[in-house]
Amino acid sequence: NKGVVSRVLPVEYMPFLPNGRPLDIVLNPLGVPSRMNIGQVLEIHLSLAAKVLGFNISTPVFDGADENDIMDTLDMANAYANHPFDDEELAAQKAEAEKNGEEYPEDMVTFTAQYKDVLNKEVFDYLSEHRDHRAEWKGVPIGRDGKVRLRDGRTGEYFDSPVTIGFMHYLKLHHLVDDKIHARSTGPYSLVTQQPLGGKAQFGGQRFGEMEVWALEAYGAAYTLQE
């Protein structure tokens, strides 16, 4: 959706993921329900999974991923980022935890055990070859709902509720205040109605509607209207 930039913060004050990575832009969720452009919500969920897994996803309009596909892909992304990839990695993580005197979860399942038989061989081989890419997402628990608990960059505290995160194509709408700002005192009038012209290009006046007129009349200041 289009919107205005209401606040620009230094990167260290931006909300950040559990592994310390800051967000670039935060959008108000009220921009979604009334406009009913729900595609962007599905897009942001799928983009998160695609980014974590490190590949592009093609999803044609009438033959694309449905909600369950997206949730399954998010599950897979979470397993890829946060579970050991194979038995070798599992053993290494267990040894590391023991060395540090930490408890390692007994029920930890490797990514290979979960997904090797489910995925195409090419996809699985690709994920296996590019597993270094997981470091960016390690320590970010990704739920089936695509939400993550963020911390406030200013206080370090967690926000009350989990927040939907992801990647969107976001374009700059070229309407800038510097080009729009305008004011006038006296200026050109319409020949026919003798009212001030409208718009910045004509050096026009601001429209003063019925209700604004009533506000002045209520204060007994109707003559202010002459200009």
List the predicted regions and their residue ranges.
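Long insertion/accessory domains within large nucleic-acid-processing enzymes
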Residues: N1-E227
